Amino acid sequence: MTQRLFTSESVTEGHPDKICDAISDSILDAMLAVDPDSHVAVETVVTTGQVHVVGEVRCRGYVEIPSLVRQTLRNIGFLSSDMGFDGATCGVSVSIGEQSLEIGAGVDTALEARDGAEVEDDDRAGAGDQGLMFGYATNETPEYMPLPIALAHRLARRLTAVRKDDIVPHLRPDGKTQVTLAYNDDNNPIRIDTIVISTQHDPGVSRQWLEEQLRTNVITPVIKDAGVENLVDDELTVLINPSGSFVVGGPMGDAGLTGRKIIVDTYGGMARHGGGAFSGKDPSKVDRSAAYAMRWVAKNIVAAGLADRCEVQVAYAIGRANPVGLYVETFGTEKEPISAIQEAVQKVFDLRPAAIIRELDLKRPIYAQTAAYGHFGRTDLDLPWERLDRVDDLKAAISR
């Protein structure tokens, strides 16, 4: 039997890029909390001893950004310069301007409304940018996610938990996980081939001790909790800090930037990506809201039994409410004609930006919790785009 190896990775909240995502989304949440109609595009850069926040916003309230930055860093665990970064003493610079009036006008008054015709309320708000967004779902896991990224995220979350709960001492915030799975010709996972964990740690920690601790307190519990013990055999390769010592990490080890972990944030490379990042963007930006909607669509299609795997693409033009394109792909696993599935999607889901924002209730401060460990398949969170609330509607639309 032919085995094909597929790999996905995740990173912890102390990874430099994820620090930036967390800061950007914390600022977004704070602005939505004081003004749900805020338009926000915030980028963060971190480097040794410094945090730089830049972007464009429109918000009718006030947010104390430097304090928010420092609190986010403390929550992650950067508490001392001894570990390379101190949230209390690092430099914080803020350079945020007002959103472009031209962009704001296109979002507030869509092309359909500007044409002078009578339009519905949901036709009045245009997409915040052009672009294409993808959503994906598969029935290979209970959370409808590809197993490699699901396991990588579980390992990363557990790695952070054992650090914060002091189950494994001497760990520091920065870390990465990676999982390689073997798939058969029917695209079913048959065994876990390789697990890689790299974690920042205090000086003087031996690699042998670290491997024993992480095997016992991270890998074994995750495998059991995920219910994939049957995929583990004697040929499993486990690599713990394969580069050796990892004392210098976080922003001291590498500069970080918002939006550089878009594959970690989505499906681990198992599905296509439109290129737009999520963090620091309010839901008028379809990079974020439409990608969430596409996950909602794909997950409900698979849960309805219409396909075993599903990828959905949508595309928008800036300032226009209605999508310019919709494409459904089921990789030969469809149980109904793809044309019928796509027609059902168009009947059941309203993909105009204003409708997406309303149906998923996206003008809320819910985004900082998604900044690390993935935006999809989160069994630890109640996220509106993960709800299976259109399954019956899709089935009914197909049967008509």
UniProtKB/Swiss-Prot annotation:
* A GO CC annotation given for this chain: cytoplasm
Q: Which Pfam families match?
A: S-AdoMet_synt_C (PF02773), S-AdoMet_synt_M (PF02772), S-AdoMet_synt_N (PF00438)
Q: Which residues bind K(+)?
A: 43
> A Gene Ontology MF term for this entry?
magnesium ion binding
Q: What class of enzyme is it?
A: transferase
Q: Which family does it belong to?
A: Belongs to the AdoMet synthase family.
Q: Quote the gene name from the UniProt entry.
A: metK
Gene3D superfamilies found in the cross-reference section: 3.30.300.10
> Which residues does ATP bind?
15, 174-176, 254, 260-261, 277, 281
Q: Subcellular location, in the record's words?
A: Cytoplasm
Any idea which UniProt keywords this protein has?
ATP-binding, Cytoplasm, Magnesium, Metal-binding, Nucleotide-binding, One-carbon metabolism, Potassium, Transferase
Region of interest (Flexible loop), residue spans: 99-109
- Free-text remark on how the cofactor is bound: Binds 2 divalent ions per subunit. Binds 1 potassium ion per subunit.
User: Where does the protein principally reside?
Assistant: cytoplasm
Q: Transferase as a keyword?
A: yes
Assembly and partners? Homotetramer; dimer of dimers.
InterPro entries reported for this sequence = ADOMET_SYNTHASE_CS, S-AdoMet_synt_C, S-AdoMet_synt_central, S-AdoMet_synt_N, S-AdoMet_synthetase, S-AdoMet_synthetase_sfam
Report the superkingdom from the record. Answer: Bacteria
Record-given protein name = S-adenosylmethionine synthase
Please give the NCBIfam families that the UniProt record associates with this protein: metK (TIGR01034)
Q: Where are the bilayer-spanning segments? A: none
Q: Which reaction does this enzyme catalyse, per its entry?
A: L-methionine + ATP + H2O = S-adenosyl-L-methionine + phosphate + diphosphate
Task: Summarize where L-methionine binds, as residue positions.
Answer: 56, 99, 254, 285
Q: What is its EC number?
A: 2.5.1.6
Q: What Gene Ontology terms for biological process does this UniProt record contain?
A: one-carbon metabolic process; S-adenosylmethionine biosynthetic process
